[in-house]
Amino acid sequence: MKYDIIIIGAGPGGIFSAYELVQQNPDLKIAVFEAGHPLEKRHCPIDGDKIKSCINCKSCSIMSGFGGAGAFSDGKYNITNAFGGTLYEYIGKNQAIDLMKYVDDINMKFGGEGTKLYSTAGTSFKKLCMQNKLTLLDASVRHLGTDINFIVLENLYAELKDKVTFYFDTPVKTVEALDPGYRISCEDASYECNQCIISVGRSGSKWMEQICKDLDINTKSNRVDIGVRVELPAVIFSHLTDELYESKIVYRTEKFEDAVRTFCMNPHGIVVNENTNGIVTVNGHSYEGADKQTENTNFALLVAKHFSEPFKDSNGYGESIARLSNMLGGGVIVQRFGDLVRGRRSNAKRIAEGMVEPTLAATPGDLSLVLPKRILDGIIEMIYALDKIAPGTANDDTLLYGVEVKFYNMEVELDEHLESCHKGLYIIGDGSGVTHSLSHASASGVYVARQIVKGNE
């Protein structure tokens, strides 16, 4: 079977590539290959009753399937060049913002209308942060919520399913360069195309690395972010979340001058497990619907680690720390902040007596046995710094779940069109190492679709 264009990965980059290609040229013969399930079949078996922890499904419904890892996220689209990737370095700052706004318009068209667009513009919290050695990054944030985000994806799939051929539960094994075009091989068949877009996300990092080796595409080591997910009463951060929803706050530690940042803030949200390459880490979700909201807010505190020669395996470093947590706790570990600073392990009794009711069934433990001292010291410093702008953050009963790890793909060598050294082979989204967010990944998909159509004219 031969197609004009094959897209590998049905995450945000792949979806928006397919959408824009159809808009630009409805006559194109397009196929999308996805290792995971269709959206309606993506169900995590963890129910909190019979199954309380990850059972390592062959295809993780949280990380893979139509919508990618973002399908069950809280649907935050950050419209900014300040964080979320370096797409602007390839296509220019103005065009990057314009594409993110275009993605926002599409999300509104397909079910997101009525959701709020938050902005840091003119906020007094910027000054408050500066007065306490913190930096609030500028951004506009569209919060869809996990529930509305799911509806948008349903509607996008309904729009595309009769115009694009989808192959679900069909992992691609290899990508072979022909002259011209490409051949992709799956377990039972091979397919050819004139042009290929690879958009495999962070969960496809190991696969992407192998493909780059096979095709002699240059890469360079990126980074890994390691930290914890903080859970506390929603009222403590309500003055920030009511106005900004998500605040990206950065602190530079006193001793090591490491940057510690807040990430993925979920007002009235829940803490969840996440499975990456068989390793269980922690994440957070939130919902737009009031009936699904909790009394807690959660967010990540992350320390970015960049490595120099000779070490190149930043993701392997993060995985080893996450595996240690899994070994000690059988999955995710939870600890009271008060216990952490006193050097003692948390137990179920002290957590149950605290004022924060956990939203994830995790194993009480001691994070100091898991996280490197430099990272843990930075997190503790950051919590005390946040306590100055949100009093109560450093309460003894504040819960810390570990570990949270954000893996980044090796950064693939691409030109200004996001095209590799092989003509017609484009690599986009988080799988490229260029983007690290829903908005940037989606925008990269739109951009490449337009580049392909323009180049084929």
Predicted segments, located by residue:
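Residues forming the flavin
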Residues: 1-81, 121-123, 127-457
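Dinucleotide-binding Rossmann-like beta1-alpha1 core, especially the glycine-rich loop
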Residues: 65-115
